[in-house]
Amino acid sequence: MKVQRPKGTVDILPAESGSWEKVETIARNFFKRANYREIRTPSFENYEVFSRSSGESSDVVEKEMYDFNDKGGRHIALRPEGTAGVVRAYVENKLYGPDVVKPFNVYYIDNTFRYERPQAGRQREFHQIGVESFGSNSPLADVETIMMGHDLLAELGVKNYELHINTLGNAQVRKDYHDALVNYFTPLKDQLSEDSQRRLSMNPLRILDSKAEEDKQFLPDAPRIVDYLDEDSKKNFETITDMLEQLGINYVLDDDLVRGLDYYTGVIFEFMVEDKNLWESATTILGGGRYNHLVEEFDGPETPAVGFGIGEERLMLVLKEQNPALFEDEGIDFFITNIGEGTEMKAVEIARSLRKQDFKAQYDVDQKKLKQQFRKADRVHAKFVITLGAKELENGVLNIKRLADGKTLDLSLEDLNDMKSVMEKIED
């Protein structure tokens, strides 16, 4: 039997994992500067965590979620998105208590799972970078979250991205809009796709996000939520957009934007990238919004919240096209070559010392001929080669060579204890 990875999964090999690490490090440092701390939740949860949060009628729950009964008969689901598990952890660990500073701000970088048709930037196991902020209903919290998404994409080197924004209003607005959609689509029910016929009775808002050809003809004339917003919802949304304008963050008011999960309330947003080398049309790489009732769904107290998630696979496709420097092999700082009796352990000691000084250093564990060692140094993209022979060891003097231009420098074994000073001499 040929052993292969499951369909919809990808091996991120060392040639690529370095660029993933760079992106995630940039994201981690970015979030830390905003005082967001990391949270790690299980890769699988009880099924109800996701069915209650995402909505029984959502495509995620109906079609895409990996769920099963474990050996103890428990109904388990693999994490299809990041927010629900974080909310569950927030409630279960009583992070809503008065001893926890609000807003409670966290970020995560996790693998997630959905049974989808694999394609470029979309796998059945994929990765999400996300943030969640609990405890503030201020429009400034929404703006902070949107601004973070905007600025993170800029820091990563993403180009040609556009912010699309909409609001779903409050609970009463959602109810009124729900009724309007039911009234509009009910006479058309027999002409809708099978999925949308089912959604009509469960959550007609989902019909607006349908990609089925039989549904698309009815969407342009469907009611728009903007016509059902009350004054408070309008004022809140105007405050948010005014702040974005003051911050110089351009946006597109998008009445068609509804998002794919049922827990959103208030402002929702997506950052879309247009790159003809990747996709025929603009594609979402970051999406989020406000969800003020999800904590209550998990039996917690009334808690406003807002957040976003980034699909890391799509992000990496964009960055490979738009910021290729992130994908360059940085190589190592030093390769220690050695020849002659008694030099092996000294090469090990030198590499060990350099690593302790935060340099990347390697030596040849196979102890091949010197010519082969130099060839290996070139293949691993070493910046410098340190050569150690029996004579050099006896005299306590080493030779260091910069491979880029051949510049050399002799140094004593003691010099290795302060290699940063040696590097400064070479650069002069």
UniProtKB/Swiss-Prot annotation:
Keyword Kinase among record annotations: no
Q: Which NCBIfam families match?
A: hisS (TIGR00442)
Q: Which GO terms describe its biological process?
A: histidyl-tRNA aminoacylation
Q: Which CDD domains match?
A: HisRS-like_core (cd00773), HisRS_anticodon (cd00859)
Q: Per its record, what are the GO molecular function terms?
A: ATP binding; catalytic activity, acting on a protein; histidine-tRNA ligase activity; transferase activity
Q: How does it assemble?
A: Homodimer.
* Record's keyword terms, sorted: Aminoacyl-tRNA synthetase, ATP-binding, Cytoplasm, Ligase, Nucleotide-binding, Protein biosynthesis
Q: What is the official name of this protein in its record?
A: Histidine--tRNA ligase
Q: Which GO terms describe its cellular component?
A: cytoplasm
Q: Which residues form the signal peptide?
A: none
Which PROSITE patterns does the entry link to? AA_TRNA_LIGASE_II (PS50862)
- In terms of superkingdom, the source organism counts as Bacteria
Q: EC number(s) in its UniProt entry?
A: 6.1.1.21
Q: Which family does it belong to?
A: Belongs to the class-II aminoacyl-tRNA synthetase family.
* Catalytic reaction list: tRNA(His) + L-histidine + ATP = L-histidyl-tRNA(His) + AMP + diphosphate + H(+)
- Localization (cell): Cytoplasm
At the top of the EC hierarchy, this enzyme's class is ligase
Species of origin reads Lactobacillus gasseri (strain ATCC 33323 / DSM 20243 / BCRC 14619 / CIP 102991 / JCM 1131 / KCTC 3163 / NCIMB 11718 / NCTC 13722 / AM63)
Q: What is its main location?
A: cytoplasm
